[in-house]
A protein has these predicted regions:
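Short, T/G/N/S-enriched strand-turn elements that build extracellular solenoid repeat scaffolds
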Residues: 32-34, 51-56, 73-77, 99-100, ...
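Positively charged n-region of N-terminal signal peptides that target proteins for export
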Residues: 1-5
Length: 220
């Protein structure tokens, strides 16, 4: 009997400790990064639990607006091959994940880029959406979301477009005609408006989703 009471007491203490952790407030600070687009050919963003909104900039610069805390931050660097990378890093402990996520505003990355000046755009994130405007890049676009949607207006890439979600939908318009593309697509547990396989195009379009719909039009 004493052993049972002791175990119940320890359980209650554990719940109290975890409840205390869940009410802890985290302070976020807004950060801003900018660079002249003449220095950048490729942008590669690798994030976790972040919504990523891509917009067009009003000039020839690239801008990134984001938020950091003492426990969650980003490493931004430009390599010798003109690749701008932004990668998520964290010092959060297990108990820091109790109580839900920070407000969406503090978990949103706003990327503003010039039209037609990038070679490639690569974005990965989890648990939130990726949104893009009507965008043209000279080489490739690659988007991946785990538990989120990919939404875009019109995408135009010189060579390759690759889009993938898990537990999310993919919606938008690809610029061109069906004859332009070699297509691979598959929607597991969802609807697919693209052919699963089509050969003969000089561009590559790959679209995959698990537990989501693919609603993509190809139009000139």
């Amino acid at each position: 009997m004493k052993k049972i009471i002791t175990m119940i007491g320890l359980f209650c203490i554990s719940i109290a400790i975890l409840s205390g952790c869940s009410t802890k407030q985290t302070d976020f600070t807004q950060k801003n990064y900018s660079v002249n687009s003449s220095q950048i050919q490729i942008i590669n963003i690798d994030a976790i639990d972040r919504k990523i909104d891509v917009e067009l900039s009003d000039d020839d610069k690239i801008y990134i607006d984001y938020y950091e805390s003492e426990q969650e931050f980003f490493n931004i660097a430009v390599s010798d091959d003109h690749t701008l990378t932004m990668s998520y890093d964290t010092e959060k402990q297990l108990t820091d994940y109790i109580g839900g996520n920070a407000p969406l505003q503090n978990r949103t990355i706003r990327l503003r880029i010039p039209q037609n000046l990038l070679s490639s755009l690569i974005i990965k994130t989890t648990n939130e959406d990726i949104t893009l405007p009507s965008l043209t890049v000279t080489d490739s676009v690659s988007m991946y979301v785990n538990h989120g949607n990919i939404q875009f207006d019109t995408l135009d890439a010189g060579n390759t477009i690759s889009l993938e979600t898990k537990n999310g939908n993919i919606n938008g318009t690809i610029l061109g005609s069906y004859d332009d593309f070699t297509i691979e697509s598959f929607a597991k547990k969802g609807e697919n408006h693209l052919p699963e396989s089509k050969a003969g195009g000089n561009k590559i379009l790959k679209v995959f989703t698990n537990n989501g719909d693919i609603q993509i039009d190809i139009k000139k």
